[in-house]
């Protein structure tokens, strides 16, 4: 085996060991927080412009290089929600929710995705959870509106 190939394999093994040890690729590769913030700004700008394929690529990169940042997962999930990939969005929101400290937005958006998939019971559970657990008034109000609307729809259906 050539010396260059041995060095390349050793670098690859070192990267794998670092990642398995809990390091994120941005740190292993020496990518600064400022650079990651700039990439996030591009991703968000693409998202706002409706350039969802471009936004998806950037958010995907960000998630790979810093899998501990819930904002990156939220961005990627939001892209999939807008692209009507609701189940994928639900899965990604679950990661964002697990990593976000008392951030109940992913749970609210998961409820929206369940509604889009016609899973009213699961959506209701998400909205009830947000209403019970969230401390942000605006988030609680959004959950309450969804629950009230679902209640009115169910009442109208039972009267028919």
For each predicted feature, which ranges?
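Alpha-helical repeat scaffolds
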Residues: 91-95, 125-129, 158-160
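A contiguous pocket-lining binding segment that forms or flanks enzyme active sites
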Residues: 104-107, 116
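Alpha-helical adaptor scaffolds
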Residues: 33-105
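Short acidic DE-rich linear segments
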Residues: 3, 153-160
